[in-house]
A protein has these predicted regions:
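Cytosolic-side transmembrane-helix boundaries in multi-pass membrane proteins
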Residues: 1-31, 184, 204, 211-218, ...
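Alpha-helical transmembrane segments within multi-pass membrane transporters and channels
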Residues: 95-134, 280-281
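Single transmembrane alpha-helix segments in multi-pass membrane proteins
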Residues: 31-93, 117-124, 265-275, 308, ...
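Membrane-helix/interface signature in polytopic inner-membrane proteins
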Residues: 184-225
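Hydrophobic core segments of alpha-helical transmembrane domains in multi-pass membrane transport
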Residues: 22-35, 63-64, 134-140, 178-189, ...
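Membrane-interfacial amphipathic/re-entrant helices at transmembrane-helix boundaries
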Residues: 1-60, 94-99, 172, 214
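Transmembrane alpha-helical segments in multi-pass inner-membrane proteins
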Residues: 225, 231, 241-307
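Transmembrane helix-bundle core of multi-pass membrane transporters
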Residues: 126-193, 219-222, 241-250
C-alpha cells in the first residue's frame, strides 16, 4: 500500500525507497549502533560526531560541485594542509585572526581556480590534473613548513582564531554552525540560481551545454574554485581545533570526501545528485566511525567496513542507473 500526496507523488514505492536509500541507511546505522552501545545516542556524543564530521562534510560539498560537472578533485586534502599552514603562520606572527582566515580562503579559491583552468582550458583530464596538484601542493606544504608543525601560539588573537574550531555559540560547536551554513548556501545555489542549473547541465551533457551558449569553461573554473575555497575553510577549522597545522594534515581526506558524495547518491558520471544526499553521506561516515570506535573495533577493521559500505553504495547506484 502506498501513500499519495496532492501532487501525485507516491511514497514507499520501490522508486521512492531507492531515492531515499542514503537516509534509510543512516537511520538503520543509528538504530543498530544505539542498540549495541548505550553511550552512542547522547547529546554530547552527537555533538562530538557532528563536530568531527564537519571537516569532511564541508570538503564534500565542494567535491559535490566538481563531481556534478563530471570532474573530480584529488587535491583537496593537500590544499587543506597548505592553507591551514598559511593561516596558522599568520596567526602565529600575531596578525589579526580574521585576516588569516581571509588569506587562507582567498588562497584556497585561487588554487582551486588554477586547477579549474588546467582542466577546462588545458583540456587535461580532471583525475590527472588534480593528482598532479595533490603532489605539488603537498610538496609546497612540506617546503613551507619545513616538515614541522606550525603553532598558532597562545595569544588572544590565537584564541579568536581557535573560536572557529572549538567555540560553542548557543551551546552548539562553531564547526557545526559553519557546516550548516555551507550546506544551506550550497543547496540554495544549486536549486535557485543560474549557476546551479548550469552545473547540473554541464555534468548532464557538456556538448549540449556548450551549444546552448553556456560558457562551460567558466562553470568548471568556478566549481573548482569553490571546491578549493571549501577545502581551505575545512583546513581553517581543523587548525583552529588543534591550535597547530600539521604538514601531513588532510592525507586521505579526498577519499573521505568522495565517499560522502557517493554515499549521498551523486553519480560519479556527473549531472545527477543532491547536496542533501552529500550531507547524509558525510553523516553516515561520521556515525560509522564513531560507532565502531565506541564498540572497540580496530582501526584496521574499520577501513575494511568503510570500504564494504562504499562498495555497496556504488553497486546500488549502478543498479539504479
Amino acid at each position: 500500500m502506498t501513500t499519495q500526496t496532492v501532487s501525485g507523488r507516491r511514497y514507499f514505492t520501490k522508486a521512492w525507497l531507492m531515492e531515499q536509500k542514503s537516509l534509510i541507511a543512516l537511520l538503520v546505522l543509528i538504530a543498530i549502533v544505539s542498540t549495541l552501545s548505550p553511550n552512542f545516542f547522547t547529546i554530547n556524543n552527537l555533538f562530538n560526531i557532528l563536530q568531527q564530521t564537519s571537516v569532511n562534510a564541508i570538503m564534500a560539498v565542494g567535491m559535490t560541485l566538481v563531481i556534478l560537472t563530471s570532474g573530480i578533485d584529488l587535491s583537496v586534502g593537500s590544499l587543506l594542509a597548505l592553507t591551514g599552514a598559511v593561516a596558522a603562520s599568520i596567526v602565529g606572527i600575531e596578525v589579526n585572526a580574521l585576516v588569516a582566515v581571509a588569506a587562507a580562503l582567498a588562497l584556497g579559491a585561487a588554487i582551486g581556480a588554477v586547477t579549474g583552468v588546467i582542466v577546462a582550458k588545458g583540456r587535461v583530464q580532471a583525475f590527472i590534473a588534480t593528482l598532479v596538484m595533490m603532489l605539488l601542493l603537498r610538496g609546497v606544504t612540506m617546503v613551507y613548513t619545513n616538515g614541522s608543525p606550525v603553532n598558532t601560539g597562545f595569544t588572544e588573537n590565537a584564541d579568536l582564531f581557535g573560536w572557529f574550531g572549538i567555540g560553542r555559540p548557543l551551546g552548539v560547536p562553531t564547526p557545526v554552525w559553519i557546516m550548516g551554513i555551507v550546506f544551506l548556501a550550497a543547496w540554495y545555489m544549486l536549486h535557485h540560481t543560474r549557476l546551479g542549473r548550469y552545473i547540473y547541465a554541464l555534468g548532464g551533457n557538456e556538448a549540449a551545454t556548450r551549444l546552448s551558449g553556456i560558457n562551460d569553461n567558466k562553470i568548471k573554473i568556478i566549481a573548482y574554485s569553490l571546491c578549493g575555497l571549501l577545502a581551505s575553510l575545512a583546513g581553517i577549522i581543523e587548525v583552529a581545533r588543534l591550535s597547530s597545522a600539521q604538514p601531513t594534515a588532510g592525507t586521505g581526506y579526498e577519499l573521505d570526501a568522495i565517499a560522502a558524495v557517493v554515499l549521498g547518491g551523486t553519480s560519479l558520471a556527473g549531472g545527477k545528485g543532491r547536496i542533501v544526499g552529500t550531507l547524509i553521506g558525510a553523516l553516515i561516515l561520521g556515525f560509522l566511525n564513531n560507532g565502531l570506535n565506541l564498540l572497540g573495533v580496530s582501526s584496521y577493521y574499520q577501513m575494511i567496513v568503510k570500504a564494504v559500505v562504499i562498495l555497496l553504495a556504488v553497486l546500488v547506484d549502478n543498479k539504479k542507473q
